[in-house]
């Protein structure tokens, strides 16, 4: 019995550390990009997946101790996909006491009508969903729209654009919506997916499958995701270093004439960004930038416990 109690205490301690790490990551992202301001009404887009559940939980937790006042309203879009469990999210949100709105729109029927059988439906579905969420944000008086994309999503998008789109473009932590009316934020921008997976398992969130529509997964994104996971296993710290690189861009050492005036460089010009060694190899640190040794997370694997609230 004492051994069981000892293990339980250790598990709760490790889970508490995990929640603290996620909370710290979200807090830093919010501060770095000024995501949330005094009086904001945040529309939290809740899909029923691990990422959006985690985002809502951490934002609720931060709300209790933040130096500014902001409110949350959770929004789920019921797209009338066959087998969608309509009762799960309302029951979960009512239990938490979170304000919410379920938006019912038969986008599934529209997509099935417009897209031939066997073709990827994600592009049209995404456009329809985006428009509905923008409209809903206006109706609710939301000042910010929060999406659950995390650090791994941002890196995957960067490599997708480099490999297939020929551009260095990622997924911004904060942006103006394409209709020019809404500010979109990604509070999980600094969070690792593996931390989110462990947290979701520990909290036993009522996960709703993401493939109810029957659409094929994005194979290109899957290839990139597998590549990054392999790198993370074989070369610890590489993921952290690549994400750090996205925050430390040197336009004068790339090739985009829209970002830097290469033609303007003449004899007598000032040295820019430290210049270039030109003929010498640049010194590279032995340890990856931004990397920290992995904490002992073995006790976090496959746990389904209530996490201690961090105040």
Curated annotation (Swiss-Prot):
<dbReference type="InterPro" id="IPR014729">
    <property type="entry name" value="Rossmann-like_a/b/a_fold"/>
</dbReference>
<dbReference type="InterPro" id="IPR035107">
    <property type="entry name" value="tRNA_thiolation_TtcA_Ctu1"/>
</dbReference>
<dbReference type="GO" id="GO:0005829">
    <property type="term" value="C:cytosol"/>
</dbReference>
<dbReference type="GO" id="GO:0005524">
    <property type="term" value="F:ATP binding"/>
</dbReference>
<keyword id="KW-0408">Iron</keyword>
<dbReference type="GO" id="GO:0000287">
    <property type="term" value="F:magnesium ion binding"/>
</dbReference>
<comment type="pathway">
    <text>tRNA modification.</text>
</comment>
<feature type="binding site">
    <location>
        <position position="213"/>
    </location>
    <ligand>
        <name>[4Fe-4S] cluster</name>
    </ligand>
</feature>
<keyword id="KW-0963">Cytoplasm</keyword>
<comment type="similarity">
    <text>Belongs to the TtcA family.</text>
</comment>
<dbReference type="GO" id="GO:0034227">
    <property type="term" value="P:tRNA thio-modification"/>
</dbReference>
<protein>
    <recommendedName>
        <fullName>tRNA-cytidine(32) 2-sulfurtransferase</fullName>
        <ecNumber>2.8.1.-</ecNumber>
    </recommendedName>
</protein>
<feature type="binding site">
    <location>
        <position position="122"/>
    </location>
    <ligand>
        <name>[4Fe-4S] cluster</name>
    </ligand>
</feature>
<keyword id="KW-0004">4Fe-4S</keyword>
<dbReference type="GO" id="GO:0016783">
    <property type="term" value="F:sulfurtransferase activity"/>
</dbReference>
<dbReference type="InterPro" id="IPR012089">
    <property type="entry name" value="tRNA_Cyd_32_2_STrfase"/>
</dbReference>
<comment type="function">
    <text>Catalyzes the ATP-dependent 2-thiolation of cytidine in position 32 of tRNA, to form 2-thiocytidine (s(2)C32). The sulfur atoms are provided by the cysteine/cysteine desulfurase (IscS) system.</text>
</comment>
<keyword id="KW-0808">Transferase</keyword>
<keyword id="KW-0460">Magnesium</keyword>
<feature type="binding site">
    <location>
        <position position="125"/>
    </location>
    <ligand>
        <name>[4Fe-4S] cluster</name>
    </ligand>
</feature>
<dbReference type="InterPro" id="IPR011063">
    <property type="entry name" value="TilS/TtcA_N"/>
</dbReference>
<dbReference type="GO" id="GO:0051539">
    <property type="term" value="F:4 iron, 4 sulfur cluster binding"/>
</dbReference>
<keyword id="KW-0819">tRNA processing</keyword>
<keyword id="KW-0411">Iron-sulfur</keyword>
<keyword id="KW-0820">tRNA-binding</keyword>
<keyword id="KW-0547">Nucleotide-binding</keyword>
<keyword id="KW-0694">RNA-binding</keyword>
<dbReference type="Pfam" id="PF01171">
    <property type="entry name" value="ATP_bind_3"/>
</dbReference>
<keyword id="KW-0067">ATP-binding</keyword>
<keyword id="KW-0479">Metal-binding</keyword>
<dbReference type="GO" id="GO:0000049">
    <property type="term" value="F:tRNA binding"/>
</dbReference>
<comment type="subunit">
    <text>Homodimer.</text>
</comment>
<feature type="short sequence motif" description="PP-loop motif">
    <location>
        <begin position="47"/>
        <end position="52"/>
    </location>
</feature>
């Amino acid at each position: 019995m004492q051994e069981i109690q000892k293990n339980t205490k250790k598990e709760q301690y490790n889970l508490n550390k995990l929640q603290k790490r996620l909370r710290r990551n979200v807090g830093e992202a919010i501060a770095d990009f000024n995501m949330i301001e005094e009086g904001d009404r945040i529309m939290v887009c809740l899909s029923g997946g691990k990422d959006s559940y985690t985002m809502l939980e951490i934002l609720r937790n931060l709300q209790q101790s933040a130096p500014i006042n902001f409110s949350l309203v959770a929004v789920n879009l019921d797209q009338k996909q066959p087998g969608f469990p309509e009762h799960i999210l309302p029951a979960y949100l009512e239990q938490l006491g979170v304000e919410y709105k379920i938006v019912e729109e038969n986008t599934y029927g529209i997509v099935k009508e417009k897209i031939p059988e066997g073709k990827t439906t994600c592009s049209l579905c995404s456009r329809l969903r985006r428009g509905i969420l923008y409209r809903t944000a206006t109706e609710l008086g939301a000042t910010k729209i929060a999406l659950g994309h995390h650090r791994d999503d941002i890196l995957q998008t960067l490599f997708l654009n480099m490999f297939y789109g020929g551009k260095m473009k990622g997924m911004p932590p904060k942006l103006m919506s394409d209709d020019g009316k809404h500010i979109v934020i990604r509070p999980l921008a600094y969070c690792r997916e593996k931390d989110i997976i462990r947290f979701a398992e520990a909290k036993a969130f009522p996960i709703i499958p993401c493939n109810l529509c029957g659409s094929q997964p994005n194979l290109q994104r899957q290839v990139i995701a597998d590549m990054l996971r392999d790198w993370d296993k074989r070369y610890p710290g590489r993921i952290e270093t690549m994400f750090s690189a996205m925050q430390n861009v040197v336009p004068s050492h790339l090739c985009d004439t829209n970002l830097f005036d290469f033609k303007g460089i003449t004899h007598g010009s000032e040295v820019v960004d430290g210049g270039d060694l030109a003929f010498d190899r640049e010194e590279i640190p032995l340890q990856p930038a931004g990397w920290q040794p992995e904490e002992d997370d073995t006790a976090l694997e496959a746990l389904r416990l209530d996490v201690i609230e961090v105040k």
